[in-house]
Design a protein with these regions (language model features):
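Bacterial N-terminal signal peptides
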Residues: 24-36
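N-terminal secretory signal peptides that target proteins for export/translocation
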Residues: 1-20
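N-terminal post-signal-peptidase region of extra-cytosolic proteins
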Residues: 44-59, 64-65, 82-110, 152-155, ...
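Bacterial Sec-dependent signal peptides at the C-terminal "C-region" and cleavage site
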Residues: 35-44
Length: 222
């Protein structure tokens, strides 16, 4: 009979050491795993848009210094996201190619589902103040200024082909696998990597795309 009063000695196998380079790669591998999640099942947010005016109207507020995007409505913050900004985040955007994220009051002027960055919500940059400042400094013509003012006041997409630049918006990560992997490895969140846009994880921008309509006010703080 066995003496069960004594612990049975089991053969122990030596643990294999995990190499240091592999340990360093673990955060990046986890990032890639998150980015590869199928976003097609991401549901609409519980705070879905409930009207175009009054207390129910949503507002997007982006704080560049804190790198946070808030969805506000009904007098409170409904959702907060960590964001990535332009490679040159300090200061307001003033010209095409300056890698800066705009600052000021804007609105969602268009939405694009088939974007190379998964989903794209266009922001109405350049806005009125951008156009007026640029005209006073001689950066754009009077016709360009008037065209921007007209479109913005109509609630439409302003010209994106002036010296002030355009195609600034809220989007996800690239749909191209190689580029998405490259950004994930060398610019992990919250490091800034865009040309001036505001970037979220793909499942996050999917939520915004389904719940934030064209016309939603956008405030971008320094």
């Amino acid at each position: 009979m066995h003496d069960f009063s004594l612990p049975m000695k089991l053969p122990l196998r030596p643990l294999r050491r995990i190499s240091l380079p592999l340990l360093k790669l673990l955060p990046f591998l986890l990032t890639i795993l998150i980015l590869s999640v199928d976003c097609s099942h991401a549901g609409s947010l519980a705070w879905a848009y409930q009207g175009r005016g009054g207390a129910n109207r949503l507002r997007v507020v982006i704080n560049k210094k804190a790198q946070l995007l808030e969805i506000q409505g009904k007098g409170r913050v409904l959702r907060t996201y960590r964001v990535c900004l332009g490679l040159n985040p300090t200061g307001a955007k003033k010209a095409a190619g300056d890698k800066r994220t705009p600052e000021g009051e804007y609105f969602i002027c268009m939405k694009q589902a088939g974007s190379k960055f998964h989903r794209f919500l266009g922001i109405s940059y350049p806005g009125e103040q951008d156009a007026k400042r640029a005209f006073e400094k001689g950066l754009i013509s009077l016709d360009a200024r008037n065209s921007i003012l007209e479109k913005v006041r109509q609630g439409k997409t302003p010209p994106w082909n002036t010296k002030l630049g355009g195609w600034v918006g809220i989007h996800g990560y690239p749909t191209d696998d190689y580029r998405r992997l490259w950004i994930s490895l060398f610019f992990p969140k919250p490091h800034n990597w865009t040309d001036g846009c505001i970037a979220l994880w793909n499942f996050e921008v999917e939520q915004l795309f389904r719940s934030v309509p064209v016309g939603t006010p956008v405030t971008i703080l320094p």
